[in-house]
Design a protein with these regions (language model features):
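Distinct, well-ordered alpha-helical segments
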Residues: 33-37, 69, 92-110, 129-137
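An active-site-proximal structural segment forming one wall of the substrate-binding cleft
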Residues: 1-27, 61-76, 102-110, 173-184
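Glycine-enriched alpha-helix->loop->beta-strand junction motifs that scaffold or abut catalytic
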Residues: 110-114, 143-146
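Active-site clefts of carbohydrate-active enzymes
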Residues: 81-92, 119-125, 142-178
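Active-site groove signature of glycoside hydrolases
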Residues: 2-54, 84-88, 115-118
Length: 184
């Protein structure tokens, strides 16, 4: 299988030094809990209506697939490669609770390793709060050990029409948001 081939090669050092970290599990939290799939087990997993639901939850009926992913990554990843959980919407207080719970659950399980949390960092110029960013980043650092911004971007303000007349002002707003974030 691809899994055996890749991890067999990784264990033999073929990819040494190529990666500093692995995104082991991505986007497994919704609200303050795990994403689940409440659709009948008799249904095909490729049904479009599953949407944001987790097909793996559909198979396992628990968070064990997340634990196993980190267990296998810990077993096969080179020890110098950091293992990440990565998610979006991470500045929302409710989602922060769910993400911290996932991190704590993984770290408490036997045979796992989780070194860092990846904040996808999709923000809006209109609603970005450096204070909120700092608050949740500190919670993630306490739970995971390290935090990384993995996909940082700022959506333009709702009033921006992409015309040349307002472009400089909009770019200034975006630059200011970046400054606030890095000063937090």
């Amino acid at each position: 299988s691809v899994f055996d081939h890749y991890f067999g090669e990784a264990a033999n050092g073929k990819y040494d030094g190529l990666f500093y970290g692995w995104d082991v599990v991505n986007e497994a939290v919704i609200g303050n809990s795990y994403r689940t799939d409440t659709v009948s087990a008799a249904e095909s997993l490729d049904e479009i209506r599953h949407g944001n639901n987790s097909s793996w939850w559909h198979v396992y009926k628990s968070n064990e697939f997340i634990i196993n992913a980190f267990r296998y990554a810990n077993q096969y990843a080179p020890k110098n490669v950091e293992l990440y959980y990565n998610d979006f919407g991470e500045t929302d207080n409710t989602k922060c609770e769910g993400i911290v719970k996932l991190i704590n659950d993984v770290k408490a399980a036997d045979g796992t390793r989780l070194d860092a949390f990846g904040m996808q960092a999709h923000y809006s110029v209109d609603s970005f709060s450096a204070t909120q960013f700092k608050t949740v980043a500190e919670k993630y650092a306490k739970a995971a050990g390290k935090v990384q911004l993995t996909e940082l971007d700022f959506k333009s303000s709702a009033s921006y029409t992409s015309g040349m007349a307002t472009q400089e002002s909009e770019y200034t707003k975006i630059a200011y948001c970046h400054k606030q974030l890095f000063d937090a």
